[in-house]
């Protein structure tokens, strides 16, 4: 007997997004790195299935599991605001394969200045693409803004790494291994706000509970961007803090000293082990669809809401991005 899918809401989350565990399960699903390998035609099929489900025209014989799988592919590859297919490298599902390579090499090649500069540049190039790909698309970003953001973040990361390398020359070796994390954290504090500065200037689009646009709020933008910065630093922290401790001990073992050529691949592999868990955990720290009390909004926006709605509106909602 076929399941009745006429009332199936494909946009309803499978897990409770009001709880941390529910959000982690959700992001484990859509940041699955295996989806990066899914062919384009299958992604296009997923989009068609999602759109048909939204219109209530699901093909006969379709199973619920097929719709869940289609939604997983759709969420992993298509932007939540525009519905456009995102570039592969910028998708959150590419965070594990892309991040593990860059993190592993940043942690391995931290001693020489050219290596530090090169890998910080690679990392910031990757971050800039991810930030742009996962931005709140309701707030357009100009090419000039992207360029300024990219240059500023890269300069910050390199300056932090180079400066701390010089300061830690006489410090214990382990301290020097933590320099890449300090550079990454500092750059995230610059890169994300700079890339999304338009939202801070003009405000982020806020909606009512029925998804009707109300206006734009700079305060909401500041909250959303701050949460994204915290999430990104949290994503990198365990691997970039604990791996140096582990490698510092492993490199004292004789058999590890004999195979120095494998040190970098080992750090890449271990970085992947951390990221495969930390990407969904960090993304799930805060709800993607944020809820904000109207009383926190700008006074003029509060007045607009009071004039537009007869009944009191307690909260507004907005997509904070990833």
From Swiss-Prot:
Membrane topology listed for this record: Multi-pass membrane protein
Superkingdom in the source lineage: Eukaryota
Location in or out of the cell: Mitochondrion inner membrane; Mitochondrion outer membrane
Positions bearing N-acetylmethionine: 1
TM annotation in the entry: 100-122, 142-164, 174-192, 228-250, 265-287
GO biological process: mitochondrial transmembrane transport; serine import into mitochondrion
GO molecular function: monoatomic ion transmembrane transporter activity; transmembrane transporter activity
Catalytic activity from the UniProt record: L-serine(in) = L-serine(out)
This protein's UniProt keywords: Acetylation, Amino-acid transport, Membrane, Mitochondrion, Mitochondrion inner membrane, Mitochondrion outer membrane, Transmembrane, Transmembrane helix, Transport
InterPro entries reported in the protein's UniProt record: Mtc
GO cellular component, one term: mitochondrial inner membrane
PANTHER family: SIDEROFLEXIN, SIDEROFLEXIN-2
Annotated family: Belongs to the sideroflexin family.
Role summary: Mitochondrial amino-acid transporter that mediates transport of serine into mitochondria. Involved in mitochondrial iron homeostasis by regulating heme biosynthesis.
UniProt name for this protein: Sideroflexin-2
Species of origin: Bos taurus (Bovine)
Gene name per UniProt: SFXN2
């Amino acid at each position: 007997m076929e399941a009745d899918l006429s009332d199936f809401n494909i946009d309803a989350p499978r897990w409770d997004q009001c709880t941390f565990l529910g959000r982690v399960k959700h992001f484990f699903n859509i940041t699955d790195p295996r989806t990066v390998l899914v062919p384009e035609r299958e992604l296009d099929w997923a989009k068609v299935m999602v759109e048909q489900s939204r219109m209530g025209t699901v093909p006969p014989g379709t199973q619920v599991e097929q719709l869940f799988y289609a939604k997983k592919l759709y969420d992993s590859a298509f932007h939540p605001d525009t519905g456009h297919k995102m570039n592969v490298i910028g998708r959150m599902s590419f965070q594990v394969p892309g991040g593990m390579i860059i993190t592993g090499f940043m942690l391995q090649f931290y001693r020489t200045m050219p290596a530090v500069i090169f890998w910080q540049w690679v990392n910031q190039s990757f971050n800039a693409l991810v930030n742009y790909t996962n931005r709140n698309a309701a707030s357009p970003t100009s090419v000039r803004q992207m360029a300024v953001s990219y240059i500023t973040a890269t300069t910050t990361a390199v300056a932090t790494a180079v400066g701390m390398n010089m300061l830690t020359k006489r410090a214990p070796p382990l301290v020097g291994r933590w320099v890449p994390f300090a550079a990454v954290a500092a750059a995230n504090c610059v890169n994300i706000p700079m890339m999304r500065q338009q939202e801070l200037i003009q405000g982020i689009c806020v909606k009512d509970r029925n998804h009707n646009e109300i206006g734009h709020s700079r305060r909401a933008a500041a909250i959303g961007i701050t949460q994204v910065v915290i999430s990104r630093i949290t994503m990198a922290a365990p691997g970039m803090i604990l791996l140096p401790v582990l490698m510092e001990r492993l490199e004292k073992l004789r058999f590890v000293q004999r195979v120095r050529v494998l040190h970098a691949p080992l750090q890449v592999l271990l970085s992947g082990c951390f990221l495969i868990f930390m990407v969904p955990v960090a993304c799930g720290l805060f709800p993607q669809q944020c809820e904000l009390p109207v009383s926190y909004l700008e006074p003029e926006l509060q007045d607009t809401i009071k004039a537009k709605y007869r009944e009191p509106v307690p909260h507004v909602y907005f997509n904070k991005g990833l």
